[in-house]
Structure formats: C-alpha cells, structure tokens
Amino acid sequence: MAADAFLLIFGLLLTVLIVAQPLGSGLARLIEGETGTLLQKFEAGTARLFALDTTEMRWQQYAAAILTLNLIGIVVLFVLLMAQGVLPLNPENMPGLSWHLALNTAISFVTNTNWQAYSGENTLSYLSQMVGLTVQNFLAAASGIAVAFALIRAFSRRCVDTLGNAWLDLFRITLYVLLPLSLLLALFFVSQGVLQNLLPYQHLTTLDGAAQTLPMGPVASQEAIKLLGTNGGGFFGANSAHPFENPTALSNIVQMLAILLIPTALCFAFGKAVSDNRQGHALLWAMGLIFIVAAAVVMKMEVIGNPHLLALGADSAANLEGKETRFGVLTSSLYAVVTTATSTGAVNAMHDSFTALGGMVPMWLMQIGEVVFGGVGSGLYGMLLFVLLTVFIAGLMIGRSPEYLGKKIEVYEMKMTALAILIPPALVLLGTALALSTEAGRSGILNPGAHGFSEVLYAVSSAANNNGSAFAGLSVNTPFYNVLLAVAMLLGRFAVMVPVLAIAGSLVVKKRQPESKGSLSTRSPLFIGMLIAIVLLIGALTFIPALALGPVAEHLQFGLTH
C-alpha cells in the first residue's frame, strides 16, 4: 500500500512538472506581450471592434477593469438564473432559482469558488450551465491569471508605473491558453465516455420494472474548464464522483493533472519572467513539500480507517464510505488533497465521510490560503504574499532592509501583505462564529457534536478561500447560508486581489537593485524552509483552536467511545 501511495504521489507530480514546463514558457511570453506580428494585428483589430483602449494601465485602472468585468458577470448570471424558467434550452422545464440561491451561485462562479448549494441535474437548464456557468469559469480563471501577470510584471519591470492592460491580458489568456487547452481536454473526456449533448433526460425502465431517469447535457465542455481553471463546480450534484463526469481511472488521473497544470506552469513562468528560473523552482519546492506531506497523511488516515471494523468481521478497516470503488481509497484521498490544495473544490469522493483527521487535512489546506499550488493565478500571488512576509521577517532577523528580487519591501507593501493574508482567516472565524451563534445557522447542522461544528467550519473555510468543496452534511440552501457564504466568497476573492494589485503598483515603480554578497538568497533550501515554516505558523496560530474543537475533538471522541 505504501508503494502504491508513493507511485501515485510522485508519478502525478513528475508528470505535472514535465507537462507544465513548456506551458510556463508560453505564459512567460504572454506576460512580456510576445505574441507575434500576426496575432498582434488580430488583437488590434479585435480591440477596435469592441472599442477597447489597449494602453498600459496603472494598478488602480487595472483593478477597476477586473472589478468591473466581475461585477457585470455577477449581475448577468444572477438575472439568467432567476429567469431560466422562461428561457430556451430548458428541456426539463427547470424553474428559475430563488433570489438567494441565484445570488449565491452567481457570486460563487464569478469568484472562482463554484460553491454549489444545489444539484445541477435537477436545478439548472442547459442554457444556465453553458452560457452562465461555463462562461464564468473562463472569465474567473482569466481574472486570477491576469492579476498574477500584473504582480509578476511588478518584479520584472523597473521605474515605470504601469502593469499592462487588463483587457488585453484577459483576451490573451482566454484565447491563447484556456480555450485551446479546454478544447483538447473536452475531446479527451468525450473519448472516455463523458456526456456532451443537448438531449432531454432519458426515462427508462430497469429490468426489475423500476423507473429510472438518466440526466443528459453538455458535460465535457464544462468539465474541461472546471478543472483547468481550478473552478470545480460540477455539472451534476455528485461532481467528479458521477460516472457521466469522471467515468474511468484514466479520466480521474487526467483530471488531477489538469487541476495542477496551470498553477505549476505559472511558477515556471514567474522564474522566466524575472530572469531567474530558480525563483520559480523555489516556490515549487515549497508547494510540493507541503503537498507531499498532506497527501501522505490523508492516505494514511483513510487506509487505517476504522480498525473496529475488523472486530466485526470486515476484510479491511480502510475507509471506503463515500468513495467510488472504481477509484479506491488511495486515489480518492489524493484527489481530495489536489482539489483543496488548489482552489478547485471538485470532488470524486465525499469529504464528509472521510475520517476525522483525514478530513481535517483538506480543510487545513484551504485555511492556509490555498497557496500549495492554489488556484490559477491566485495560488501564485497568494504564495508570493507569504514570500514577502518571509523576506520581511528574515530581514529583521539579520538586520538588513528586506528586499525581494532587488526590490525593497517597505511599510506600504507590508501593510497590504498583512491585509491580504489576514482577511480570509478573519472571514472564516467570524463567519463560523456567526453561524453557530444564530438559530438560522444552527438549524442547518444535521450532525451533532464535533462533526457538526466541522461541517460549518469547512463550509465557511471553503467559501472564504474560494474553494467550493463541502462537508455535505450541512443544509446550506437557506437564505442565511446563501447570503453568509456569498459575502465570504466576494470578500475572500476581491479583498485579497485589490491589495495584491496595490503591492504590484508600489513595486513596479522601484529600481531593481543588483544582488550583493549580503543579500538574502530567496532560492536557497534555507529560505524554502523558512517560507514553509511561515505558512505553517500562520495557519497554526490562526486555526488550531478551531480545529481542536472540530476534527481533533471528533478523533479523540472516536477513540474514547469505542
């Protein structure tokens, strides 16, 4: 079993690294605007057609463009979901959503969270899935990558006050990266048996005479960008545990590869853009080491499972509850780590059915800010926030002015860094406290005790960190939870994104000082270790009390009561 786990983890990471390197080179060229003469003419013609100003933007203009696009997306998707009952491509006559569910869903998909308080097959029309959710999957992913591009340019440029053009970045990312990769991945999924049609649901009679309904729909096209864009929202309620979304062991492995591909490629792109590949490698080492330990712990906990089952005559104590037998314990555990280390939130097993400590690790990966690979764009800029914090602390320790890649890190950058790092944990803890202190919040808890607390903590952690996965035992399709989680998703996305752009705007105007013998090396094993320690320390200081009341208490109760 240990050998199988080793092969799964390292085989996945090795494959991702091999595939991500050439993509990282392509992304680096996009960051520098190297698209070729023919494509530049096409971009100029498209800009004239839509009357877009392609001049370079300062950080305030860049942020305004991103926020405007996403605000329009929320409004359009909200209206579409409310009105889907009278719109076409609705063969099952799905009614419009309630205002609070439509608001929650619109904010969820625009913020790259894809939290779903509904099951798609009995709630949404094909039009809502295609024109509403799938389009936002592209735009949300492009928004995150664009902000990462802006921050990378802040380190690679010097003595200017612009970060690029948001509209041009969004256009290039969508057209040259997300669309081609999604098309290839969708075709692969169709070859594996994932649905892609506009047929009405199929009503059948089984051999024993029972009626059965098979949902149909354009699944593969949404599935591809759901994974590549680390969005995570499933076409069906069971998400990637559903055989129409994830039918084979091969499709399951490719899904994990797709989730990790762009976050990994962005680290390579960062190294190339700042003319020091080892800087990107250092980030990957930090992410990879945390990922390996997290995956090993979850696999170990799920394999140990419930030893008391052996006394009852079971063949194995491994925790198979809530898991697909076609994937097994190890692959399901690895998928859970992949989807929560990133901001994806797609699931091929029910996290609510994991063991107490096996479920705690995915929750903790979200709570540390999803900087272990993280979401497309957001993972890189989230980890760079921790890099700036580490550089600042290291500078205090050695008595030197902190700097990163030759740029001095001063008071303004640290204020924005602290703000961006502290907002998601504050949202998690305050949101959980509000849910547990009100009758509306407590009424949604279906399981008593420590596990019920864990379900609430997981839900708010998932929303505030834009993940979208859930401990499904919590009843969340209520006005209280739909509004609470919508606010958490909105602030967790944009209250981090704006300070990141503010940091970029402050750094891009600074000179890039040459590295000296006294400079702190930010690519050494020592710095990588410090970076990991800072990430773990922030997570520990913030969430250990809450985790002790939830999964840790549940684990101890299990041992004491059995």
Swiss-Prot record:
UniProt entry keywords in alphabetical sequence: Cell inner membrane, Cell membrane, Ion transport, Membrane, Potassium, Potassium transport, Transmembrane, Transmembrane helix, Transport
InterPro entries: KdpA
Membrane topology designation: Multi-pass membrane protein
GO MF, one annotated term: potassium ion binding
GO annotation, cellular component aspect: plasma membrane
Residues passing through the membrane, by range: 5-25, 63-83, 132-152, 175-195, 250-270, 279-299, 327-347, 356-376, 379-399, 416-436, 483-503, 526-546
Domain of life per record: Bacteria
Pfam family, one: KdpA
Subcellular location field: Cell inner membrane
Function: Part of the high-affinity ATP-driven potassium transport (or Kdp) system, which catalyzes the hydrolysis of ATP coupled with the electrogenic transport of potassium into the cytoplasm. This subunit binds the periplasmic potassium ions and delivers the ions to the membrane domain of KdpB through an intramembrane tunnel.
Family statement: Belongs to the KdpA family.
Subunit structure, interactors included: The system is composed of three essential subunits: KdpA, KdpB and KdpC.
PANTHER family attached to this UniProt entry: POTASSIUM-TRANSPORTING ATPASE A CHAIN, POTASSIUM-TRANSPORTING ATPASE POTASSIUM-BINDING SUBUNIT
Protein name per Swiss-Prot or TrEMBL: Potassium-transporting ATPase potassium-binding subunit
Organism of derivation: Pectobacterium carotovorum subsp. carotovorum (strain PC1)
